[in-house]
Amino acid sequence: MLPFFLFSPESPGQNLDRKISLDLNNSSLEETLVRLAELGNFRFSYNPGALPLDRPITYRCRKKPFRLVFDELFGSYGIEWLEVESQIVLKRSHSEGQSGNTVRAGPLPQHTVSGFLYDIKTGEALIGTHVMVRPLGKGTTTNEYGFYSLSLPEGMNEIAYSYMGFREEVRRVNILKDTLISVNLTETSLGMREVVIRARDNEQLPAVNQPGDFNFSGAVLERLPGFTGEVDVLKALQLLPGIRSFGDGSALYYVRGGNNDQNLLMIDEAPIYNPSHLFGFYSVLAPGAVNDMEIYKGDFPARYGGRASSVINITAREGNRKRFSMSGNVGPYASSLTLEGPIKKDEASFLISGRLSTLNWMNYLMDNTSSFNLYFFDINAKVNAKLSRKDRIYFTFFTGRDEFNRFTNSVYRTYGISWDNLASTFRWNHVFNPKLFSNTTLCFSSYDYNLFLSSDRKNYWRSSVGNFTLKSDLTWFLNPSNTLRGGFSVSRYHSNPGNITRQPGEEEEQIEVREVSQYTSMEYLIYLGNEQKIGKRLSLNYGIRLPVWQDFGPASLYYFDANHQVIDTVTVARNTSYATFFSPEPRVTVGVALNDISSLKASYSRTTQFLQLLSNATGPFTSLEVWAPAGPVIQPLKTDQVTLGYFLKFASSRFFLSAEGFYKYFRNHIDYADHANLLYNPLLEGELRFGTAWSYGLELMLQKPAGKLTGWIGYTWSRSWMETPGVNEGTAYPAGFDSPHNISIFLSYDTRKRWSFSANWIYMTGNPVTSPVGFYELNGSTVPLYGERNNDRLPDYHRLDLSVVYQLNKPGKRFRHNLSLTLYNAYGRANPFSVSFNKYEDAQGNFLVPSNLEGDYQLVPTTISVAGIIPSINYQFKF
């Protein structure tokens, strides 16, 4: 067959180094050659019978030299190109592994490229790094350990590695077999780092973003104006649509109409039952120890469960594998110090971060009638070691403690409370082969809450909860469009719902002791999930989670009649099972990319929660922590959620817009009898009522991720309702955390020199409360009369936080330090968190509690709020 010549009219000389932009969409090879000949004034010579001229081609590039375009374009089809005098000769390649511009002919075999992504300065694994093969349109992201895997055709491939705040790294690799490629990325200047809350998965491929799921990187957390000048993980959550806090002085947060105990927060896979310090003003996570934070408030991947509303997975930093480093934050309310460095360079490292409160100086500002002792501390530590190219181990340890005691000179004296968190995790990563990755975890977590009942602190009411878990997770990268995840876990839980602890020989002090049964439970779990892309527009993420829950003795079980009176008592022997639950949890997400900048998502998920927090407190300082498992009386909480989302990038990807609607339905939802007694009550379950709940809402978010001015605006409209037989006359009423309108605004301005400024503003509809509908006289006393539950609301909550940071060092210096000024609640808004109706106002305008109720008092509502403006000046350093 005679050769075929395709040439331009003028047939000038070649210019293979000239750059072009090209956009081909299902063009045939023949049409592509015509286009290239016109663009570059090229003459192509080839045998038409030897080339797949009808094969469709989709290819995009921007400002690439013709030489590289030919490599990528022709190499994908096993075509060899050669420059011979004034023409480009094309022919099928018949040799393997040739140098130059040749690629293997025929149907190309697939090979797997896998490896890890690291920060070149610290050796820290980079989570969520984008790995893209641009000519093929294939891509993936690194997992929580920085690992990735891609199947690519044999031959020359261009792989781009990109991570927010780091320079892109591009590798041209001739793939002839399964290949391990680990890459170190270089951080850009801090002034240029983007501030963006990434939707999970690859932001270059909208079709794989999960509805309701977000990720906070370190770049985001660094710029948020945290309480008293310190970055705070829990405060950052309040800025996301669909997540709201209780208010000041509380660590409680609520996700899409779920209660606060329906949120699972983990540090390196170990659950933290109370993630707060100082009644929620600080989180238990020192910012120097946080590497990455995933937030799932939509459908959870099948590997996550145990809670009904959200999962927050925090990955602790691993420590600098290159050199020793120290950083710290010195402030008026708390100070922290972080040490990290290599144990063996590039092979093993450590990190230890500690924080201690410095609050006792505030006693000098108080009057002589009262004083308090309030302190907290926490320690985060992590060690990791590379055993081989395929094995790495991690050990994480966390402990934290809070204590609050207030003493007065009056007859009334409060002895105080304390709470402790302890968690540790041992993990082993193993790469079986380039497509199969495993992680095995052994973790322990416990939480204790103490209410002191005597001045010597030897008698106290104590509740606790803890778990011990063994789990294994496997990830099988079948191909770039299909990833299979599966695993199992076995967990043992122990819960003490509240008993009095005494030291030997102590007097009774007129405190009645009633033994409350403790709980022991086991959970067995297997799960399987699949992340799949079908074509260029459709993505699926589906799976199933199969948990089994069992309760074991010893225990004393109480059974109640319809009037909640005890009708039977059963004593269960040790290690005897008395309740078993099995609850399959299907999850599915479907995504459709409408075009290159917009996509739609829909999801359905079922979650089951076997362990629940019992509390009828209405304020943040009165909560008694009681955790109880599902059993003969308490049924597992089951939640079904559907979501629909729309995602858009516009203005050349300078702005991101998301809109999501959701509906959740809760079965076996716990409610409480009026004036329920949960304090060392052996008949605790008789105070509970069970019904249904539902929530629905719309969440909007607009982000500007890059430039000197960055930030986002979030708005949520939502409602949360409860309906329980025997409560509120069986009619529906708003949940205690129902808040129809929530607005969050965050702005950050970086001068790219030494100054940076940030601000956030939060607005929430006031929390529902139950107010008296009238008062009546009984035996000379004024008694409030209550109507429907949650028939009123506190005033709306809003707060402005401001922060300014001045960099003391010149750019490029190893020793970096700065001063920051933060104003929490900058305009001094008094945001009430509780209201009471037991006081009257005297002639001088003072609010007093009547010494006796046999008087003509006009009771008035009074509220309690946290102090107004809270300023802080902090000094931060790092070297």
Predicted regions, residues:
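Periplasmic N-terminal accessory/gating domains of Gram-negative outer-membrane beta-barrel systems
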Residues: 138, 165-167, 194-300, 311, ...
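Outer membrane beta-barrel strand-and-loop segments of large Gram-negative receptors
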Residues: 467-471, 515, 629-635, 641, ...
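Signature of Gram-negative outer-membrane beta-barrel scaffolds
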Residues: 490-598, 610, 621, 727
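C-terminal beta-signal and adjacent terminal beta-strands/loops
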Residues: 754, 763-779, 797-799, 805-879
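Surface-exposed extracellular loop regions of Gram-negative outer-membrane beta-barrel proteins
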Residues: 448, 494-508, 512, 550-564, ...
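Gram-negative outer-membrane beta-barrel transporters
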Residues: 662-665, 684-773
